[in-house]
Amino acid sequence: MACHCFPVFPNDDEPQSPESECISCDAELDFQLDETCELPGELTVAIGEGPDDFLPLADGEQPEFYAGFQGGGHSFFSVQVGNVELSRYDRLEVVVDAYYPEECPDDGTHCGPSYGRRVVVLDGEPWTLVDGVVQEHGILMQLEGQTVAQVTVRDPCGRVGWAQHRW
């Protein structure tokens, strides 16, 4: 899998970034819908934090903030996806977005349009399988102030799941 890595260098005033050569990784892989695939149910999606693991976030909880060397800031998100059929397919399409609260209605509906990055991921690193649920950690996002993070996941069978986290 090909990766584009984005190192983060914290300053001494903020928590230190975990030691890692590659903190975020975008896969350069094709994603195609399989018109013959029909699976019941939806994908379940949860947003957490963590550069090395999935750590759930409580409602309204802000993820840990790491200061960048040029004065910006970053947080590490993690994603958990359930109801995945790894026996049927080996990749997912994941879109990670961040919005200002005024750009996203507070009524539980999907925000849009998408400004995030499209990530197509195979199973295996950086994804892990934990108790039947697929997890990815170390998704680097540049955030400042109040934010709505949104993750939308689609499998090759066309099933979609999404989650939002506000703070």
Question: Which residues does each predicted region cover?
Answer:
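Signals and flexible motifs at protein termini associated with secretion
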Residues: M1-W167
